[in-house]
């Protein structure tokens, strides 16, 4: 169904800067441009940007997908900020603070910021909206987008749906209008905490699913692991202030199922590689892109202990990644836990 003229005009006035030239940032930039949103795309690797300017595609990550006419790759990040009505950040969580620090001195007052990063800040374990509050101030309009999304499927026009969460409904609605299209449905939420935690913790659980499948434990095990993983996720999010219904939605259960069951997931592939005997560094090199769950396992387990939240699956992922536990032994530890009521 065609959009109303008024909404099309709104989109054409919402010049958006996408920060991050990986597969996900590029996919979102293409999505925005297809939606008639004038879009600028910046990446840290200036040689990569220069190549995108010439070829009109991202040969490194999405080589078969041409850029729409309204998508413009750029090399001058600070200069672009003066032309921007909203900013979308799609970088790994380890790069989120450095990018925000770079944006902070040049971003026009109260230009809305949305991020599509699915992780917690490494080292501190902070939610990314806390980093925004620290660097941009308490009144800055911000939102987060999360849900079951693989970049290649999004640019192929395969249908999916996501959640955009913001503390102000107007901000969530504005970003939702920019992203919403014929095959990309956007719902809004006010649960900034729950949406962020769904996107971060599911990465850890996907490593567990990859380990399980890599060891040949089968569909029963995978289904049980996803279900008990969801219980851990809900427990953790509630302790942090998230809402239960958020974790039953797209940014929780939806993304968890996707990431645990499809080999497009880098986190799942990490688990598969570990089950096959690869060391962590070998597996990460083999995958060749950021694997958010590896860093998230550290901060999730540490924060769970601070909050007195029991997360046995996440704990065993941590033990495999950083304490030398064999993947098969980790599964045995989980299976031998004391019998208890399901929702105790």
UniProtKB/Swiss-Prot annotation:
The active site is at residue 202. The keyword Amino-acid biosynthesis does not apply. The keyword NAD applies. InterPro entries: 6-PGluconate_DH-like_C_sf, 6PGD_dom2, G3P_DH_NAD-dep, G3P_DH_NAD-dep_C, G3P_DH_NAD-dep_N, NAD(P)-bd_dom_sf. GO terms for molecular function: glycerol-3-phosphate dehydrogenase [NAD(P)+] activity; NAD binding. It is found in: Cytoplasm. Its main location: cytoplasm. Belongs to the NAD-dependent glycerol-3-phosphate dehydrogenase family. NCBIfam families: PRK00094.1-2, PRK00094.1-4. Catalyzes the reduction of the glycolytic intermediate dihydroxyacetone phosphate (DHAP) to sn-glycerol 3-phosphate (G3P), the key precursor for phospholipid synthesis. HAMAP family: NAD_Glyc3P_dehydrog. This is Glycerol-3-phosphate dehydrogenase [NAD(P)+]. The gene is gpsA.
